[in-house]
From Swiss-Prot:
It comes from Cytobacillus firmus. May bind 1 zinc ion per subunit. Monomer and homodimer. Part of the essential Sec protein translocation apparatus which comprises SecA, SecYEG and auxiliary proteins SecDF. Other proteins may also be involved. This is Protein translocase subunit SecA. PANTHER family: CHLOROPLAST PROTEIN-TRANSPORTING ATPASE, SECA INNER MEMBRANE COMPONENT OF SEC PROTEIN SECRETION SYSTEM. Keywords: ATP-binding, Cell membrane, Cytoplasm, Membrane, Metal-binding, Nucleotide-binding, Protein transport, Translocase, Translocation, Transport, Zinc.
Length: 473
């Protein structure tokens, strides 16, 4: 049974239910929430927004109330830090560049007058403890410089303030140039700001604005959910195939006798080969019996062991039966030569190696298919349906390939006796003791008689050596 606990699951309720079949239950807080969540402030430009953010931080800092500034990226956190340095407001920056000081910075973030700039990942899972006199000032104030694509992350940022019944407040500062607003913001909101002729530094503060932003976030979440759901549907195809292969592999590992499995594989290979060359829509005279004979002799039997006359005049079922009988007889002979114990071990090794290699190749092929399958949509075909169909065909082909390779290796394996290994195993020396052998005497190097080029040739022709046998030397 799957279960989990988190403070921000409610916004993802639909995904938990549809994909994992899990319901989301909201448990009441331990103590009543005293945090005040102020409506969003939306500005016309990003420049105006950051001016307002810095002004707000400076005001709150003067009161002594601690501020936690949440940013979407490291770049934004450094920009806010730069602006605060110009105003000479002391602060700490908590991002990926100085994560080693994370514990120290978080510990002081709730102290009076503290200003902390943090990305959404920094300092998560840590309660910011309020210092002396901070509760009277209103607790920790969380200031968001931008809305995230997911409401869940915004809720995590808000939740840094007002923990365990402590006082606190939160507010987000937005601009029409923010990534979220540019991609998913309402055109009505833009035209409304233009019609009102609002100044750059004049914000809109309205629950309607906050709701419009939440609607934009829901659209993003919906798009992301659809993308994850589609990925899961594609992954389900591989998951089903993986379960089948792993189940069969486990059976091989746990089994002490694979003979029945091997015999089934051999019969399947014979049946497939016979069916391939004896189609039902052809008359027996047109069947390619020689192709069956050549395949069987090359992969399952010895050369010449099966002849065309052995299967001529038989229907496909009788052919399969006749060939299977020959192959199983050959299998029994091989087992006698190899001994049953060694045969079982050999079968297991061959089967595991073949399955592992073929499965790895199949994963690569499925990955290649997945990368280009979306192009089928241009042909008015459903890419997911095409992926399932072709993936199943490829899986069937892989299973057939495993059966053929295992059958061939087992039936074509040669039993070789390694005499030297046997002697070593018995403790006998492979070579005689060289200490008792007499050292070989070095033979003198004999040089033949050299003949000058102008001397008489040794063949007795009377010619000079250079003009006879020595010509060209």
């Amino acid at each position: 049974k799957l279960a989990g606990m988190t403070g921000t699951a409610k916004t993802e309720e639909e995904e938990f239910r549809n994909i994992y079949g899990m319901d989301v239950m909201v448990i009441p807080t331990n103590k009543p929430i005293a945090r005040i969540d102020k409506p969003d402030l939306i500005y016309k430009t990003m420049e105006a927004k950051f001016r307002a953010v810095v002004n707000e931080i400076e005001e709150i800092h003067k009161k002594g109330q601690p501020v936690l500034v949440g940013t979407v990226s490291v770049e934004t956190s450094e920009l806010v830090s730069k602006l605060l340095n110009k105003r000479r407001v002391p602060h700490h920056v908590l991002n990926a560049k100085n994560h080693e000081r994370e514990a120290e910075i978080i510990e002081g973030a709730g102290q009076q007058g503290a200003v902390t700039i943090a990305t959404n990942m920094a300092g998560r899972g840590t309660d910011i403890k309020l210092g002396e006199g901070v509760r009277e000032l209103g607790g920790l104030h969380v200031l968001g410089t931008e809305r995230h694509e997911s409401r869940r992350i915004d809720n995590q940022l808000r939740g840094r303030a007002g923990r365990q019944g402590d006082p606190g407040s939160s507010q987000f500062y937005l601009s029409m140039e923010d990534e979220l607003m540019r991609r998913f913001g309402s055109d009505n909101m833009r035209s409304m700001m233009e019609r009102l002729g609002m100044e750059e530094d004049q914000p809109i503060e309205s629950r309607l604005v906050s709701r419009a932003v939440e609607t934009a976030q829901k659209r993003v979440e919906g798009n992301n959910f659809d993308a994850r759901k589609q990925i899961l549907q594609y992954d389900d195809v591989m998951r089903e195939q993986r379960e089948i292969i792993y189940k069969q592999r486990m059976e091989v590992l746990e089994s002490d006798n694979l003979r029945k499995i091997v015999e089934t594989m051999i019969k399947d290979v014979i049946d497939r080969t016979v069916r391939l060359h004896t189609p039902e829509n052809e008359v027996p005279e047109d069947w390619d019996l020689m192709a069956i004979v050549n395949y069987m002799n090359a992969n399952l039997l010895q050369e010449g062991e099966l002849e065309e006359k052995d299967i001529k005049g038989l229907d496909p079922e009788e052919m399969v039966e006749a060939i299977t009988e020959k192959v199983i007889a050959r299998y029994n002979e091989k087992e006698e030569q190899f001994t049953p114990e060694h045969m079982r071990e050999f079968e297991k090794v061959i089967m595991l190696r073949t399955v592992d290699r073929k499965w790895m190749n199949h994963i690569d092929q499925m990955d290649q298919l997945r990368q280009g399958i979306h192009l089928r949509a241009y042909g008015q075909n459903d890419p997911l349906r095409e992926y399932r169909f072709e993936g199943f065909e490829m899986f069937e082909a892989m299973i057939a390939s495993i059966e053929e390779e295992v059958s061939m290796y087992i039936m074509k394996a040669q039993v070789q006796q390694n005499l030297e290994r046997q002697k070593v195993a018995e403790g006998k020396a492979v070579h005689q003791d060289t200490s008792k052998q007499e050292p070989k005497k070095k033979q003198p190097i004999r040089k033949g008689e050299t003949i000058g080029r102008n001397d008489a040739c040794i063949c007795g022709s009377g010619k000079k050596y250079k003009n006879c046998c020595g010509a060209g030397k």
